[in-house]
């Protein structure tokens, strides 16, 4: 069975992430969307909230699992018996960092491949940070995130 991991913070999940999830799920028998616990970051949503939002927006993709991890991605990949890592690339600026990470991961685990998927052009500008900024100022989110995510964002910023 070919298994891939799509790691990220997903704070929050956007239509750009969902596009990569759908396309990645078509390439592998199983796709694990793995929320990274990064102690140096202060996310808007807890890991539990991010996992629940991801489950809500991927419930209809049968070969997608949602999980979370901390530590090294290569260690997590070994634990879940993943063959590959999927990374979405929006712009050339994403490539330099992601390529460096792919080389490091390959050095740490030579059997683990990184697959780069170019984002759909309509999501090339989209990031979780931009979505949070729009939400903070009460802007319309319908082009960027599913309704459930927009609702949760508005709840966070109305407190």
Swiss-Prot record:
Residues of the site described as Transition state stabilizer: 17
Keywords (A to Z) from UniProt: ATP-binding, Coenzyme A biosynthesis, Cytoplasm, Magnesium, Nucleotide-binding, Nucleotidyltransferase, Transferase
MF term (GO), any: ATP binding
Any one Pfam family match given in the protein's UniProt record, by short name: CTP_transf_like
Top-level taxon in the UniProt lineage: Bacteria
UniProt feature coiled coil, ranges: none
Compartments (UniProt record): Cytoplasm
One GO biological process term: coenzyme A biosynthetic process
Residues the record lists as binding ATP: 9-10, 17, 88-90, 98, 123-129
Protein's UniProt keywords contain NADP: no
Enzyme class (EC, first level): transferase
GO cellular component: cytoplasm
Protein role: Reversibly transfers an adenylyl group from ATP to 4'-phosphopantetheine, yielding dephospho-CoA (dPCoA) and pyrophosphate.
Protein name: Phosphopantetheine adenylyltransferase
Lineage, opening ranks: Bacteria, Bacillati, Bacillota, Clostridia, Thermoanaerobacterales
